[in-house]
Structure formats: structure tokens, C-alpha cells
Amino acid sequence: MQGPHDFHTPKSSYSKEDLLESGKGGYFGPGNAQLPAPPMLMMDRITEISLDGGAFGKGHVVGELDITPDLWFFQCHFPGDPVMPGCLGLDAMWQIVGYWLGWSGSPGKGRALGVGEVKFTGEITPDKKLVRYEIDIKRVRRGKLNLGIADGRVYVDGEHVYTAIDMKVGLKNVLGGAGDLPAS
């Protein structure tokens, strides 16, 4: 395992520009974790990131997305009854777990591998202002397949609206041939 400082200068928060740079594959080095490009990048900033915080003491991340009525998904999901698809909130949490794995020193390109349980208890609509994703890292396995398992919560304007338990994200080392991800 590399240390985070081997390929970037770790910080405790990241701007939209930092996240966009990660989407180009330039933040954690060639062949390593990167975020998707817009419009699939589902956060505008990371406000907190740590190796030892959170409910399990193994890492914690907080990301945010600014809500505006012109976001692409409101135009098509659903016409006349706009709501952010719940799967995009789940994908945002997977993105954050993958980012944390790269930030913490795990090499490889990321893929979502599954989730144990998801609950949707509210909606994100265009009249809202801020989505907050809170991720607690539960377990990390580093080896041929670098694997992160985390729990997450989504809040909109302070109201808890989604919960995900046992989200799994794997990083495969495409440069060093360190194993394949399981078929999804």
C-alpha cells in the first residue's frame, strides 16, 4: 500500500475543482481511483475526510451537493413531478467510498460492488438547497483486490432521507495486474 502523500498532498477537504481533477484521473496518479465526470459526478465538494474518524473509527467522509432546479435529472425524473433518483444518491455514496480508498493510499480503479441494504425515507426535490452525504468506513481489505465497506446516510436540508448499509467498493490495479473485480 502507498501512503496518501506518495501521489498527492492529502487535505481534509476538497473543492469542486479538486473533484473534477480526480475525474480526469490526475489526482491519485495514473491507473488509480478517479471520480466520474459531470453530469454523473454527484457531489460539489468534500468537506471532511479522515483515516480514523466515523462511527467505526476507520474513516469518515462528508460530501455535499448543491441542489438547483436546473439539475439534469429533474428534467426527466419525472416531468411534472421532479425528484432526484434515489439510485443517484446511492451512486454518490459509492463515489465517496471509492474516493476515500484512493485518498487513503489504495491503488487501482474503482467499481461499486454492491450494498447490503438501502432505505429511502424521503425525497430530494428541486426546492431543496443542500444534500449532505455522510460516510463511515467499516472495513478495508487491501491486497489483490482493495475493498472498502461503509455505511452511509444522505440528508437534504438537514432531513435524513436515505440510508445505505454495507456499501462495497473495490479497486482493481489495472497497471500492476493485481486481480480482477468480481463480475457485477
Swiss-Prot record:
GO terms for molecular function: (3R)-hydroxyacyl-[acyl-carrier-protein] dehydratase activity; trans-2-decenoyl-acyl-carrier-protein isomerase activity. It is found in: Cytoplasm. One of its GO terms (biological process) is unsaturated fatty acid biosynthetic process. Keywords: Cytoplasm, Fatty acid biosynthesis, Fatty acid metabolism, Isomerase, Lipid biosynthesis, Lipid metabolism, Lyase. Its main location: cytoplasm. It catalyses: a (3R)-hydroxyacyl-[ACP] = a (2E)-enoyl-[ACP] + H2O; (3R)-hydroxydecanoyl-[ACP] = (2E)-decenoyl-[ACP] + H2O; (2E)-decenoyl-[ACP] = (3Z)-decenoyl-[ACP]. The active site is at 77. Its EC number is 4.2.1.59, 5.3.3.14. Pathway: Lipid metabolism; fatty acid biosynthesis. It holds the Pfam family FabA. Homodimer. Necessary for the introduction of cis unsaturation into fatty acids. Catalyzes the dehydration of (3R)-3-hydroxydecanoyl-ACP to E-(2)-decenoyl-ACP and then its isomerization to Z-(3)-decenoyl-ACP. Can catalyze the dehydratase reaction for beta-hydroxyacyl-ACPs with saturated chain lengths up to 16:0, being most active on intermediate chain length. NCBIfam families: fabA, PRK05174.1. This is 3-hydroxydecanoyl-[acyl-carrier-protein] dehydratase. The gene is fabA.
